[in-house]
């Protein structure tokens, strides 16, 4: 019986040591969305005079919109647990906080983004035991193919905001809306606890990318 106890003791200690390092740990990280934008290719439309020449300005139209999801970056503090982000809720507003792209101003989407923990293995190794890891701040950028926070409806509404038909348009900001994204990321940390990360007022740059003319 005494022999059995001696054999069991190292197993119990090993189990306690492995889980003990996580007791009291939490997720300590921040996230930022940068570079999100919508470019609009616009055509200025003019009336055709009887002789076929260009007449009066009739208005402008968006021919093509070009969305860019941007880059979702994380700053993970040393010793933080990792996190797998599984969903996002995005609320679109203008710069004053008024809902934008209604009734599609709220967008829910699924994600699969694995944010690493705030530890690194020696020598840049990809795997090692926990006792070999060192608590270190980690910078992480979500894979572009996993990122979908700017919905098609919001992108179209943003591009359309550049055109009101009242004046001839030129390339640049113009009268385009100032769009903001208020994002709540939800997922589970390394221990399976549900966590949320908020990104308030992420800016969407909306601009007139190119301008052409048509006489009709």
Tell me what each language-model feature is.
Residues 12-15:
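C-terminal motif of bacterial Sec signal peptides marking the signal peptidase cleavage site
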Residues 2-9:
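Sec-dependent signal peptide recognition
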Residues 17-216:
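Non-catalytic macromolecular-recognition regions in eukaryotic signaling proteins
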């Amino acid at each position: 019986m005494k022999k059995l106890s001696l054999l069991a003791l190292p197993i119990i200690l090993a189990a306690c040591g492995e889980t003990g390092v996580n007791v009291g740990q939490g997720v300590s990280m921040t996230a930022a969305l940068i570079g999100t934008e919508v470019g609009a290719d616009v055509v200025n439309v003019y009336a055709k005079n009887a002789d076929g020449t260009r007449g009066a300005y009739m208005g402008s139209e968006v021919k093509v919109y070009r969305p860019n999801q941007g880059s979702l970056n994380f700053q993970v503090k040393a010793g933080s647990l990792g996190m797998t982000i599984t969903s996002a809720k995005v609320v679109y507003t203008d710069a004053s906080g008024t809902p934008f792209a209604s009734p599609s101003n709220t967008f829910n989407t699924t994600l699969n983004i694995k944010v690493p923990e705030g530890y690194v293995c020696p020598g840049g190794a990809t795997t090692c035991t926990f006792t070999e890891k060192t608590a270190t701040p980690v910078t992480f950028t979500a894979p572009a193919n996993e990122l979908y926070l700017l919905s098609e409806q919001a992108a179209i509404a943003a591009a359309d905001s550049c055109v009101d038909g009242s004046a001839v348009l030129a390339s640049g900001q113009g009268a385009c809306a100032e769009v903001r994204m208020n994002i709540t990321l939800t997922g589970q940390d390394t221990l399976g606890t549900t966590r949320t990360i908020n990104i308030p007022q992420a800016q969407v740059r909306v601009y007139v990318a190119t301008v052409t003319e048509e006489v009709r």
